[in-house]
Amino acid sequence: MNATSSATHTINPLGTDGFEFVEYTAPDAKGIAALKSLFVSLGFAEVAKHKHKQCWLYRQGDINFVVNAEPHSQAEQFASLHGPSVCGMAFRVSDAGKAQQYAIAKGAKPFVGKIGPMELNIPAIYGIGESTLSFVDRYGDKGSIYDVDFVFYPDWQARMAEVDAGLMEIDHLTHNAHRGNMDVWSNFYERIGNFREIRYFDIEGKLTGLHSRAMTAPCGKIRIPINESADDKSQIEEYLRQYKGEGIQHIAMASSDIYHTIRTLRSRGTGFMPTPDTYYEKVNSRVEGHQEDLAALKELRILIDGSPTKDGILLQIFTDTVIGPVFFEIIQRKGNEGFGEGNFKALFESIELDQIRRGVLDGGEDEKGARKEGASDA
């Protein structure tokens, strides 16, 4: 990035300052109960309930998850189409009203929700897959939207301490888009918020492939990789079929001690995507001088990437799909600001193994040959 483009990227028209919350829903009481149970197992405590709506706030560190079961709402409509899903997210911004107005002026579609008596009007637009993208300017020293709209339980802090697993903040979240729409959504974020591409990935596993553009806001605190499939069989296409459309694929949460976090989550029954044993045979040569405990990495199936002498390292691991096709990532950054590019192929192939076990891929040489032939025709 040259000096001019760097200066341009510092222009922050939305006044972004990170993620405020991620919102989840499900089509029935059983699904809502499953979400609540999942979040507790991940270290989130139910700390408050909405004053007038069937919405609950779950919190860990600086991460806020909202569970929305309100009848006749956008969340209910979203769940009726997608099943258990991520129906919205919110950005922290300097002025929520101005942020919404700017986004609409740049072509975003306004969202108008049902506002009850004495409730905050939280400005929002439609995002990927008709999920909501809200703008929140009440945070930090300016108070909180939850103080107005929610009632906190008397023991909410004790609840948090009891289940905490060491997750601190949302590091990034990803979008899965239909083929041809990766550029549509990257352009959307560039247009409404001056997001810029910081990484481009072209990933090919043994049988399938994907493309991804990682976009970041001018504040540097909101990072959104946007994925599209390179073929008909990849996990991106499977997600789109199962989810019945585009949407948020996974939410990455940061830990300062990933070993402690993963041991805690595994003890609570959290399942993680498999990593081949052969991956750990190459760690010392691929990430020379990493100084991590290789036995612990292998025991917990944690992935490592980066270069200690250049840009630092990161540690990461991915849960099984737990909300329909949606999953979570746990990440610890030790100087590295990437997304685990060196791990993508190993991760991609581990997901393919899971797809083969479930019958989505047949794993045969004919499949591989067909994919290569199709790629050459593109």
Where in the sequence are the language-model features?
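Short, acidic, Ser/Thr-enriched surface-loop or helix-capping motifs
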Residues: 127, 309, 321-322
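Extracellular low-complexity, Gly/Ser/Thr-rich intrinsically disordered linkers
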Residues: 324-341
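A cross-kingdom feature marking solvent-exposed beta-strand/loop segments within repeated
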Residues: 49-59, 64-93, 97-122, 157-165, ...
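An N-terminus-focused feature that recognizes amino-terminal "leader" regions
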Residues: 1-154, 172, 179, 316
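N-terminal beta-strand motif that seeds the catalytic metal site of vicinal oxygen chelate
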Residues: 1-31, 86-89, 145-186, 244-253, ...
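Beta-propeller domains
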Residues: 175-223
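Short, structured motif recognition centered on aromatic/hydrophobic residues
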Residues: 18-25, 39, 44, 58, ...
